Amino acid sequence: MSNNSLETLIAVETDARNFGFEWQNREMIIDQAISECEEIREAIHKQETDARIQEEIGDLLHAAISLCIFAGYDVEQTLEKISTKFANRMSALKKITQARGLTNLK
């Protein structure tokens, strides 16, 4: 997702909330995210088109971003934190792998 796409989604989400189209609580958004996961699984199971699967993944991303905004977190900062967290995990995993004489997990 490019920053422009992310910024656009955040702007549309904010506009929707200002218009009164908003979630009532976090649980509703979590339920929506779970529903989107189920729709992704179903689309894959039914061997639907890549475009359809991508659309469902986009819906899941939207739900996650909605939850972030609803909870009052800065989306960019949240993404930066998870990027750092994942990079640190990968660094540790690579060190363990190298210590075992391997170059990768394949």
Predicted segments, located by residue:
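Flexible "arm" and connector segments at domain edges
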Residues: 1-57, 61-106
